Amino acid sequence: MKRRYFGTDGIRGQSNIFPMTPDLAMRVGIAVGTIFRNGAHRHRVVIGKDTRLSGYMLENAMVAGFTAAGLDVFLLGPIPTPGVAMLTRSLRADIGVMISASHNAFRDNGIKLFGPDGYKLSDDIEQKIEDLLEQDMSGQLAKPEDIGRAKRVDGDIYRYIEQAKRTLPRDVTLKGLRIAIDCANGAAYKVAPSALWELGAEVVTIGTEPNGVNINLECGSTHPAALQKKVHEVRADIGIALDGDADRVLIVDEEGAVIDGDQLMAVIADSWAADGMLKGGGIAATVMSNLGLERYLQARRLKLHRTKVGDRYVVEQMRQDGLNVGGEQSGHIVLSDFGTTGDGLVAALQILAVVKRQGKTVSEICRRFEPVPQVLKNVRVSAGKPLEDAAVQQAIAEAEAQLAKNGRLLIRPSGTEPLIRVMAEGDDRGQVERIVDELVNVIGGVRNAA
């Protein structure tokens, strides 16, 4: 069933344009509150946000919805997404909300929802919310004496800092490391530098002056050039780039090279396997992760469990197969020993632990495998189903035959934008580029004909 509101990571869109309007945010609060107010106890919700301007508007709208449904609201202020997941459990809340559009520009915003266990909601529960949003919910409002209250609990972000610090092995400190960190002018602008400094590092910061409109603006994990420049400028041992809500991370080594999530997962999997910490004999990663990662793990008798795109599907696979490491090439790294969702700061701390223990440079630690050439292009579509066209299906079959066992082909609709993503990878870059270009032309031709 096609859903109207929820995508692969909650509800997302441009602020003040459907579905990211204050009216819908209030209705989401009522709908979610209706579903999660089971039991006789006083129900509560925690709400965090990143630093984008529209966060104030949406936060207040959701407070109105939740309190109207009879839930008390704890407002955390700017805090990383994993902090919301952690505090949802710690504060015994019935629901957790993160208001963020992650790595998107300030004009966008989104609503991510966590259950009382700190995990993102299942597709079934999201469908129940969608069903309620299509109904008249006036009958679901609380009695006057049962309306909820709201209060700010800004100090609870320090509980998240302490939780993150505890994930660094006790025999490791960060003394002697010069770390440049880019917080994307986002949710981690206070907590991440504080945690690194308290663990003993010399910390150089960029992207820590949010003004409501500069989140992810030429900074953060999607724009690492600023951090690469800073690493060179201050001769840092390592650069850490977070995104707007700090649930993803990329690393810049001492030479200025960017290290993506695939390489980071390889480092953590290798280290944890050697220490007897890795569970399930492998890791979970999405279909977008490089074939080089899969080959690297296979050579070490570890299995790569592939999932659909989206960290929520990575987490589902991890829970199903008993894995404790998973993630995405984009830098979502999920370490279930420490949390229930991607956590950029915690993942970075695990890399720093390996660097300190082995006494090697970041470039020596993090370049674990040579990525297989990978080409990704997008085709914009406004209507129709071009992937069902006979000519497109024939072109896909021919491309798969060309790649055979030497590569991979992935064609999928985007979960957040009106795009079809065409990705191929293989040992022969020229062949991969030709295949992607041919498929883009065929899909684009069908789109235009429609």
Swiss-Prot record:
Single GO cellular component term: cytosol
Cofactor requirements of the protein: Mg(2+)
UniProt KW keywords: Isomerase, Magnesium, Metal-binding, Phosphoprotein
Cofactor comment text: Binds 1 Mg(2+) ion per subunit.
Residues binding Mg(2+): S102, D243, D245, D247
Reaction catalysis annotation: alpha-D-glucosamine 1-phosphate = D-glucosamine 6-phosphate
One function term, GO molecular function aspect: phosphoglucosamine mutase activity
EC number(s) stated in the UniProt entry for this protein: 5.4.2.10
Coiled-coil ranges (or none): none
Covalent S-S links between cysteines: none
Domain of life: Bacteria
GO BP term (any one): peptidoglycan biosynthetic process
Top EC group: isomerase
Active site: S102 (phosphoserine intermediate)
InterPro entries attached to this UniProt entry: A-D-PHexomutase_a/b/a-I, A-D-PHexomutase_a/b/a-I/II/III, A-D-PHexomutase_a/b/a-II, A-D-PHexomutase_a/b/a-III, A-D-PHexomutase_C, A-D-PHexomutase_C_sf, Alpha-D-phosphohexomutase_SF, GlmM_bact
Gene3D superfamilies associated with the record: Alpha-D-Glucose-1,6-Bisphosphate, subunit A, domain 3 (3.40.120.10), Alpha-D-phosphohexomutase, C-terminal domain (3.30.310.50)
Processing after translation: Activated by phosphorylation.
Modified residues (Phosphoserine): S102
Family note: Belongs to the phosphohexose mutase family.
UniProt function note: Catalyzes the conversion of glucosamine-6-phosphate to glucosamine-1-phosphate.
HAMAP family associated with the record: GlmM_B (MF_01554_B)
Protein name in the entry: Phosphoglucosamine mutase
High-level lineage: Bacteria, Pseudomonadati, Pseudomonadota, Alphaproteobacteria, Hyphomicrobiales
This protein's encoding gene: glmM
